[in-house]
């Protein structure tokens, strides 16, 4: 049975600063780099040897995955990066301090933007500091100017169906090094988590989530490799 590892990037600089990051290409902190290395040790301990790593185009995910693979002695694993595994686009909240945003707009409104399934933040204004339309990584792509978790899932699912699922169905083990919300989307797909429950699923930084799948890609077992930093998992479908 194929195994899938979901690995959220290690702590980033803006995680530390409590800012809405989204698609901004911030780096890992020293703690984030240590989390990535520990993730690799856990992969080695679990005997996990992925045929491929899928990741986003953002360096905090790419560096986490690469460091984990290197620490596991798997540095030659093929890597495929795609923007559809990026973090959720936080629109007009991008770059803002979360506490200051709550003080300005009210905690209830910010909670809705952050934790509702289908309500996106205000769109990102064009031409500003965080306008991604001129970034060559997204040239010719229909990139959003804001996203909810639902619309994040809407871009993750076609990529999953076309690129990731076929590798698993072929019996290959796969690593996905990505972000809290793009990985939530994968968890929702696999575990059929209801809309009102998926927003409460927490995925800790740098802790590999191992999911064992049957031939139809239905989860048969799931566990965090670092039990001391584990979060609650959805019920197996």
Model-derived features: where do they sit?
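Phosphate/ATP-binding catalytic cores across multiple sugar-kinase/actin-like superfamilies
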Residues: 155-170
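Phosphate-coordination/substrate-recognition cap region in phosphate-metabolizing enzymes
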Residues: 39-129, 188-212, 216-219, 235-237
């Amino acid at each position: 049975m194929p195994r899938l590892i979901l690995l959220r990037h290690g702590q980033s600089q803006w995680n530390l600063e409590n800012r809405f990051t989204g698609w901004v290409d911030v780096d890992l902190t020293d703690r984030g780099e240590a989390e990535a290395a520990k993730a690799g040790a856990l992969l080695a301990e679990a005997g996990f040897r992925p045929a491929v790593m899928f990741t986003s185009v953002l360096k905090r995910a790419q560096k986490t995955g690469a460091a984990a693979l290197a620490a596991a002695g798997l540095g030659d694993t093929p890597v495929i990066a795609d923007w559809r595994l990026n973090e959720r686009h936080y629109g007009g909240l991008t770059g803002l301090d979360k506490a200051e945003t709550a003080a300005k707009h009210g905690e209830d409104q910010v909670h809705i933007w952050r934790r509702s399934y289908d309500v996106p933040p205000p769109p990102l204004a064009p031409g500003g500091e965080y306008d991604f339309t001129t970034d060559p990584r997204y040239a010719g792509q229909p990139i959003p100017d804001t996203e909810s978790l639902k619309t994040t899932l809407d871009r993750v699912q076609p990529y999953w169906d076309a690129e990731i699922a076929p590798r698993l169905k072929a019996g290959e083990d796969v690593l996905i090094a990505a972000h809290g919300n793009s990985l939530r989307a994968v968890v929702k797909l696999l575990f059929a988590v209801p809309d009102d429950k998926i927003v409460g699923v927490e995925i800790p930084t740098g802790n590999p989530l191992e999911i064992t799948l049957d031939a139809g890609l239905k989860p048969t077992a799931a566990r965090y490799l670092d039990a001391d930093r584990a979060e609650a998992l959805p019920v197996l479908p």
